[in-house]
């Protein structure tokens, strides 16, 4: 059996992480999720897709790199209303002030279109690190508003 060098492993890791960064750029969302009914928010990164092979690869890489996540499977629309069969939509969710920075630190060098959102969310996590369960300060709200504008979601609390 052929032995792989450490350089080969590093090259494979670089390739995997750059691929994952591209998936987040194209299929992901990097934001702060507001909780309805109260004034708290959580950093969140999601990847949504319907392609089983792609989803399996994302899941494999999350497990390989120790990324904590959960999965949401979205209900399909009524098939009778659609002209063609719909694929099952699956969403991988990474949430939290510790999990999100750990993931973004891995993929940030490979992001292109979502690089500004990633940098803002990393800043948000750093600013909120020691006061996760405390009231939001003006700086927290400003960071969230900038993120929401970048994502085309508005700025209201």
What is each PLM-predicted segment?
Residues 1-157:
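Internal intein/HINT superfamily modules and their associated LAGLIDADG
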